[in-house]
């Protein structure tokens, strides 16, 4: 699959915007890729083809390794939605500008993205009965992960009750750890193995 120079440029521009929002400095190199800096010190590079490149000397501390991993996570998410934005159809509804693209559509819910100078903005809407309009928008600005989760719940792909908050996950972990480390329950070896895998 060939990606045009314009698509690569839009991808790198979006990555630069998102990285800046997350506290990283990024600038273009003479080769057209992005150079990412942390505290004004080179951290890694982002080639036009996606992914990241780095020198081991630039990620020599746990903090810099974590920062490199965060950049990689950001770049993967940006690549995912920019690939979709480049190929997605325009959302055609009455009274809405043509800059929104349909990223996902299931049941009566649509997930759309709209490019802006602040990065791609995401929204989920309910379709009207005749699919000529949308309503009840949930706006996520640049938060792609939350927009995807909202779409999955609103469209019925998953039930909200199947998701846990970070606080709930902490308590589940604590209870599992207490169950196997304490003498609260008589557990079989198989039950203990399953709980430890959590």
How would you describe each model-predicted region?
Residues 59, 131-145, 159-161:
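A short, exposed loop/beta-hairpin motif centered on an aromatic-Gly-Thr core
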Residues 38-81:
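Long, continuous compositionally biased terminal/linker segments
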Residues 48, 112-137, 172, 178:
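Short aromatic-glycine-(Arg/Gly/Cys) micro-motifs in beta-strand/loop hairpins
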Residues 32-38:
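A cross-family detector of function-defining hotspots
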Residues 27, 80-121, 163:
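Short N-terminal "domain-start" leader segments
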Residues 71-82, 143-159:
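Short, structured interface segments
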Residues 1-24:
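Short Lys/Arg-enriched alpha/beta "domain-start" segment
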Residues 160-198:
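Charged/polar low-complexity intrinsically disordered segments, enriched in acidic residues
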């Amino acid at each position: 699959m060939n990606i045009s120079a314009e698509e690569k440029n839009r991808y790198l521009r979006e990555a630069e915007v998102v990285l800046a929002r997350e506290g990283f400095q990024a600038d273009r190199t003479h080769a057209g890729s992005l150079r990412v800096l942390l505290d004004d010190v080179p951290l890694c590079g982002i080639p036009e083809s996606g992914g990241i490149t780095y020198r081991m000397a630039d990620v020599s501390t746990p903090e810099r390794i974590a920062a490199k991993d965060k950049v990689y996570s950001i770049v993967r998410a940006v690549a995912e939605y920019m690939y979709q934005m480049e190929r997605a159809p325009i959302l055609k509804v009455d009274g809405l500008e043509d800059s929104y693209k349909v990223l996902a559509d299931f049941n009566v819910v649509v997930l759309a993205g709209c490019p802006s100078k602040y990065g791609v903005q995401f929204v989920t809407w309910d379709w009207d009965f005749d699919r000529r309009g949308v309503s009840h928008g949930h706006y996520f600005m640049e938060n792609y992960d939350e927009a995807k989760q909202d779409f999955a719940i609103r469209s019925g792909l998953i039930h909200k009750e199947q998701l846990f908050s970070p606080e709930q996950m902490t308590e589940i972990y604590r209870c599992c750890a207490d169950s196997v480390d304490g003498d609260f329950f008589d557990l079989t070896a198989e039950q203990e193995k399953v709980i430890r895998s959590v």
